[in-house]
């Protein structure tokens, strides 16, 4: 009898675990699907043309709007981060077990690149963030400052990273580690530096091209 109960407990555990891992990804997809449904209904899309209208609207905006393309790339990369860090993660029974770990390249004598990955992960994110929302974050002036650019990127990434770590802690989806928060934030700061350097280079090229045109 005890063996049968153990088997049923194991089956129930595996089933619940299999359902829990993709739970938040399923919630997000369901939310987006219902948003599309409401949008289509408000615009009078018919059911038999719903998919075609959806892709036609998306493609039209993608071709005509640079802001839409930038925001799409940011949303895509953000989804990739969430899938790696929160969505579809295994359950950790002790999310605070390694709160002060993960600083070096070796853990228990085993080489690991987790710290480097956490650093690199948010460099493209902060670049895409500033690229998509430069006016909203840095103002509408023709030139942007180095300090403000790096500070805004660092602050947004720090808050976003903390929300990820807190979600992992709250729902036992990974471990809460101060090192993750630190390396993610540093990556965001470096992304801000790279964006500023790219912005300055682009601005200098524009000024140079204007000078060449005025000479002719």
Identify what each model region corresponds to.
Residues 2-173, 178, 192-216:
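Bulky hydrophobic segments
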């Amino acid at each position: 009898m005890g063996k049968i109960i153990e088997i049923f407990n194991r089956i129930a555990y595996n089933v619940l675990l299999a359902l829990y891992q993709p739970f938040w990804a399923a919630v997000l997809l369901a939310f987006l699907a219902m948003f599309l449904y409401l949008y289509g209904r408000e615009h009078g899309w018919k059911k038999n043309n719903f998919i075609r209208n959806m892709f036609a609207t998306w493609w039209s905006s993608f071709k005509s709007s640079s802001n839409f393309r930038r925001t799409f790339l940011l949303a895509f990369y953000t989804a990739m981060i969430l899938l790696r860090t929160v969505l579809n993660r295994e359950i950790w029974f002790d999310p605070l077990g390694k709160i002060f770990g993960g600083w070096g390249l070796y853990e228990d004598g085993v080489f690991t690149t987790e710290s480097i990955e956490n650093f690199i992960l948010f460099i493209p994110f902060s670049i895409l963030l500033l690229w998509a929302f430069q006016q909203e974050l840095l103002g509408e002036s023709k030139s942007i400052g180095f300090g403000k650019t790096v500070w805004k990127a660092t602050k947004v990434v720090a808050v976003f990273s903390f929300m990820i770590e807190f979600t992992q802690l709250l729902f036992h989806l990974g471990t809460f580690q101060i090192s993750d928060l630190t390396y993610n934030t540093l990556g965001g700061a470096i992304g801000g530096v790279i964006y500023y350097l790219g912005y300055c280079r682009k601005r200098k090229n524009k000024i140079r091209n204007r000078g060449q045109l005025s000479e002719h």
